[in-house]
A protein has these predicted regions:
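PP2C/PPM-type serine/threonine phosphatase catalytic domain
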Residues: 1-212
């Protein structure tokens, strides 16, 4: 699972986010086909370098600065062999290894309160934060900063459990037909007045369960 959120202050932030996610997915597809993966910092760094290479190439092709494609970047890879989480920027990845929801990596903030870091930054690789576990994740919810105030208890950056619980209950109980409707229902929820009263930013939420 990969998420990216384009910087609102640049001209190609949305395209940068799309390119980042697509490149990460393509890279992982190749790695999976190639055999067993090591879920470690090396893999996370390789993914970030690959994404950066794609963004730099796109910027050069369009004769733009790479900062015009600035975006945050979050990723989670989990298998029976373990779990790897990676992050550059704000937003978060909430997981449950069977012991309750937790936020292994804290959303990044920049020099000022409303700033963060981007995968296009010169120091992005050194800013990259990772979390590894030998356990397979049971539940995961990844989100961009647009719903950070809904998803987290801001005092201690812990998951706001009542926000996530209905989603996971719905996922676990859904039929295939209902699963096909969930993206539309999720979009309606994220666009609802109740949510928009709490945030005026773009909102992305990705959910997954490991089914027995």
């Amino acid at each position: 699972m990969f998420l990216a959120d384009g910087a609102g202050s640049v001209s190609q932030g949305g395209e940068g986010a799309t390119l980042a996610v697509n490149e990460a997915m393509a890279y992982m597809s190749q790695k999976v086909q190639g055999g067993e993966l090591g879920l470690n910092d090396i893999l996370a760094t390789d993914i970030v370098l690959t994404v950066r290479q794609r963004l730099f190439a796109e910027a050069e092709a369009k004769e733009l600065a790479v900062r015009d494609f600035a975006c945050t970047f979050l990723g989670l890879i989990s298998s029976a062999n373990g779990t790897l989480i990676m992050q550059i920027g704000d937003g978060g990845v909430v997981v449950d290894f069977g012991h309750g929801l937790q936020l292994p990596l804290t959303p990044m903030v920049g020099e000022y309160a409303n700033m963060t870091h981007f995968i296009t930054d010169e120091d992005a690789v050194s800013r990259l934060e990772t979390f590894t576990s030998t356990e397979r994740v049971h539940k995961v919810a990844a989100f961009t900063d647009g719903i950070q105030r809904l998803a987290l208890n801001m005092l201690d950056n812990s998951p706001h459990v009542p926000f996530f619980t209905p989603f996971f209950i719905g996922l676990a109980a859904a039929t295939q037909e209902q699963l096909d409707l969930l993206p539309k229902l999720l979009k309606q929820f994220l666009s609802s007045p109740a949510v928009n009263e709490r945030t005026d930013d773009d909102k992305t939420l990705a959910l997954a369960l490991w089914l027995p």
